């Protein structure tokens, strides 16, 4: 039977508090870095938002500039076409007038291409430079080697490039539209998904923390006490063994050699003034528990108790006897679970015949609250 004292209850309470503190420290060490990381992500998001707004303003300015450039380019191109068409009409009119005039007044002949092959190669090189994405334009079945066909083909190439620029511009405007900033596939939508995932992870960590705290608070205290009792029992056994070893070493190093029973009996026959034998008086009270007696390196177990105190199964009594011609000294120490209850030395002018029962009788005479019981009384 193991008696649980306040010492065990305090130890169990301290162990529970330490376990809860360890769990709290572990959870705190996991939550604090995640909170710091979330704060850095929020700062990054704010910086990205500021940069995005600035970029949107810049892109809006660029879009306005591109629109103005497109309008100006179209206007200049139309002006160039009109200017090119006017000389052609004038040349046809002059040619028609030359045919109508008499032979003496012929009009001057104009040269449109000094090198036709070079002009055609340059025109073909420009027509081969097309945008990455092709667009459907009206067909142009006009000969490129003619002036009007060449101008028409170049005009179609310019229209295709303007269509490509306009398409890219519309795509950029749609992507930067505030109504479509969080649409699927945009950088902000991907960033929003990452923040949502991080928030879910933080919620999971918080729920795990709450579960750990709940499981810690709902731990069965009886299991903890049972484990503490088993640990306490092992420590007691280890302490008993260490006490035996220490007492043996102390007796070997400090105790003077005590005469044996045979030597004492022979000395009594030769001693002119022998000590009278001690008449032991043993208590008759009932002992609630058992205790250990350590004498001369031998550990014995007998019924033992201390009245006026809670019953304890951890009582231990160490006894050493010193004999001389004048008296007999009994040194004893009474311990409870390693704590010293009583330590004293008793001298008597008697010779102890039955050890350790005579020693126990002397201790009981000194401390009446200490009681014991010998099972073998009356055998001899």
Curated annotation (Swiss-Prot):
Residues 251-275 are annotated as: Disordered. Residues 260-272 have a biased composition (Low complexity). It holds the Pfam family Allexi_40kDa. This is Uncharacterized ORF4 protein. The lineage of its organism: Viruses, Riboviria, Orthornavirae, Kitrinoviricota, Alsuviricetes.
């Amino acid at each position: 039977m193991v008696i649980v004292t306040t010492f065990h209850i305090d130890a169990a309470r301290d162990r529970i508090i330490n376990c809860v503190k360890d769990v709290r420290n572990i959870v705190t060490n996991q939550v604090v870095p995640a909170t710091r990381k979330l704060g850095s992500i929020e700062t990054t998001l704010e910086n990205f938002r500021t940069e995005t707004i600035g970029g949107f303003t810049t892109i809006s300015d660029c879009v306005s500039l591109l629109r103005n450039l497109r309008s100006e380019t179209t206007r200049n191109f139309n002006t160039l076409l009109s200017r090119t068409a006017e000389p052609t009409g004038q040349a046809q009119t002059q040619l028609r007038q030359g045919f109508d005039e008499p032979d003496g007044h012929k009009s001057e002949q104009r040269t449109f291409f000094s090198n036709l092959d070079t002009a055609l190669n340059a025109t073909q090189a420009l027509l081969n430079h097309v945008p990455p994405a092709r667009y459907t334009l009206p067909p142009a079945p006009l000969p490129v080697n003619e002036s009007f066909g060449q101008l028409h083909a170049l005009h179609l190439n310019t229209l295709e490039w303007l269509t490509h620029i306009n398409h890219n511009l519309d795509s950029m405007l749609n992507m930067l539209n505030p109504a479509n900033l969080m649409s699927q596939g945009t950088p902000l939508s991907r960033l929003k998904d990452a923040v949502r995932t991080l928030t879910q992870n933080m919620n999971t960590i918080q729920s795990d923390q709450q579960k750990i705290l709940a499981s810690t608070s709902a731990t069965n205290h009886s299991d903890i006490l049972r484990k503490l009792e088993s640990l306490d029992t092992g420590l007691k056994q280890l302490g008993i063994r260490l006490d035996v070893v220490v007492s043996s070493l102390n007796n070997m190093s400090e105790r003077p050699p005590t005469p044996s029973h045979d030597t004492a009996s022979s000395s009594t026959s030769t001693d002119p003034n022998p000590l009278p034998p001690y008449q032991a008086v043993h208590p008759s009270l009932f002992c609630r528990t058992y205790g250990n007696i350590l004498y001369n390196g031998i550990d014995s177990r007998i019924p033992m108790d201390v009245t006026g105190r809670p019953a304890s199964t951890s009582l231990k009594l160490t006894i050493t006897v010193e004999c001389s011609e004048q008296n007999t000294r009994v040194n004893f120490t009474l311990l409870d679970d390693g704590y010293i209850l009583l330590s004293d030395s008793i001298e008597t002018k008697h010779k102890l015949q039955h050890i350790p029962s005579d020693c126990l009788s002397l201790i009981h005479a000194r401390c009446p609250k200490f009681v014991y019981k010998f099972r073998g009384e009356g055998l001899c």
